[in-house]
A protein has these predicted regions:
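N-terminally biased helix-coil "hinge/interface" segments that flank
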Residues: 1-214
């Protein structure tokens, strides 16, 4: 039995196929999205061999600005790069241009991680100049943060997108750090629920770029 589940902000859609028969279900999405998934799955099957899941949990958290409280650690003088952006933006000289607020507030951007307590944050983004070529500085900072606050999630730019151009690398790393705790918490609840009722041994998740991750 194959079960496919797509969770949106309004409805949760399920598709089950046993090799001969197709079954579908549609339920309102619940505040804890895993509940609607489990309720719908119980209508279609007791046990599945392959559980495929797609969700807008990350998209919703970004649009609603409900992601993790995030700290940005970057090189001295580059704390504002995520706010300044690049000079090729369409309205470079428009003083009335309105842009979204950065995901990390100015007071939460530092060049020295020892100056703050990482335990006060759910997640940390580390993006240093030149780390696409030499990531050792980012690795040292991550080790220090992991030692000081093991429960805090850490994203490093050299692993997110190992390319030059500090704005793109930093903004991508910040986005990953901002959303990781939200998605990780949701998937942990979902997998625990799936296993507790014996529905499946694991959940495979659709990537926005295509393919699956386990």
């Amino acid at each position: 039995m194959i079960l496919g589940v797509d969770v949106g902000g309004t409805f949760t859609d399920l598709f089950a196929w046993d090799g001969e028969r197709i079954q579908t279900a549609k339920l309102p999405t619940t505040p804890d999205q895993s509940k609607a998934v489990l309720d719908g799955a119980s209508e279609l099957a007791d046990k599945v061999d392959f559980f495929v899941h797609g969700t807008t949990a990350a998209t919703n958290a970004l649009l609603e600005r409900t992601g993790a409280h995030t700290l940005l650690v970057t090189s001295p003088g580059f704390e504002d790069v995520i706010e300044i952006g690049r000079q090729d933006r369409p309205s470079l000289y428009d003083p009335s241009d309105e842009r979204p607020e950065p995901l990390v507030q100015r007071t939460d951007r530092v060049s020295d991680p020892s100056s703050v307590d990482p335990g006060n944050y759910e997640s940390v983004a580390i993006s240093l100049l030149g780390s696409y070529h030499d990531p050792s500085g980012e690795h040292l900072f991550r080790a220090a943060i992991n030692e000081a606050s093991p429960a805090t999630a850490v994203s490093v730019s050299s692993e997110m997108v190992a390319e030059f151009r500090e704005f793109e690398r930093t903004s991508t790393t910040v986005l990953n750090a901002y959303l990781t705790p939200v998605v990780a918490d949701y998937l942990a609840r979902l997998e625990a629920g799936v296993r507790s009722v014996g529905l499946a041994d694991a959940v495979s998740v659709m990537r926005s770029s295509g393919g699956l991750i386990d």
